[in-house]
């Protein structure tokens, strides 16, 4: 069983992603901490009052709704999963630390400015991957952040399939990146990244909503 954590903002791509997991050849256990995506999770299963403890099964997809957890316990969830869908900046940093393949949902901004920042990080994050693995990461991240539009020639479902196909490489890459980022102070590494893309922003710290 593939274990996936899902912590996300509202996203019109969710049901397409769930469709892919429902039809997956490998069983998927999706763990959803209580948050903004929860109403859409419930809607997929015709439950318009989802809550902590809700448990859903469709095809090869099994979804469990977890309580919202503090950061330290959230780290344990990230480490326990094979793939992590994370949102905002706090969870992004923790996903890097966790050393697991992840998909980042950047906070949406006016005029899609956030997509330029996303692509800048994608270029940095995937530069040590081979061609097919790099493409798989970029296609899925872009599809998730564009509400399911992976590009002119690829759907979210296709992007997910390619991502899973490359999962062994992506696990090794995530562990490599975690070690590299841990060698120096993580905040300094993030500052270097922000300078590289020409956008220095104050990172939201623990306790702030993202």
Map each language-model feature to its residues.
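Short, hinge-like loop/turn segments at secondary-structure boundaries
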Residues: 48-50, 103-104, 121-122
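Short acidic (Asp/Glu) and glycine-rich catalytic loops that position anionic groups and cofactors
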Residues: 58, 96-102, 167-172
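Short active-site oxyanion
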Residues: 2-4, 28-29, 61-62, 80-83
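Post-HExxH zinc-binding segment in Zn-dependent metallohydrolases
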Residues: 117-129
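A donor-sugar binding/catalytic signature common to diverse glycosyltransferases
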Residues: 68-117
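Active-site donor-nucleotide binding/catalytic segment of nucleotide-sugar enzymes
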Residues: 1-40
């Amino acid at each position: 069983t593939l274990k996936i954590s899902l912590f996300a903002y509202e996203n019109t791509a969710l049901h397409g992603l769930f469709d892919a997991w429902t039809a997956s050849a490998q069983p998927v256990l999706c763990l959803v901490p209580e948050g903004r995506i929860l109403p859409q999770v419930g809607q997929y299963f015709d439950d318009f009052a989802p809550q902590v403890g809700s448990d859903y099964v469709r095809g090869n997809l099994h979804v469990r709704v977890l309580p919202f957890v503090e950061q330290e316990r959230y780290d344990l969830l990230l480490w326990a999963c094979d793939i992590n869908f994370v949102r905002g900046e706090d969870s992004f940093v923790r996903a890097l630390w966790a050393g697991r393949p992840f998909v980042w949902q950047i906070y949406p901004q006016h005029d899609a400015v956030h997509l330029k920042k996303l692509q800048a990080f994608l270029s940095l994050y995937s530069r040590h991957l081979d061609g097919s693995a790099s493409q798989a990461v970029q296609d899925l991240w872009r599809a998730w952040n564009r509400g399911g539009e992976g590009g002119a020639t690829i759907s979210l479902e296709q992007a997910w399939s390619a991502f899973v196909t490359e999962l062994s490489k992506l696990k090794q890459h995530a562990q490599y990146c975690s070690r590299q980022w841990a060698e120096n102070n993580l905040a300094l590494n993030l500052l270097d990244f922000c300078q590289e893309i020409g956008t220095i922003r104050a990172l939201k710290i623990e306790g702030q909503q993202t």
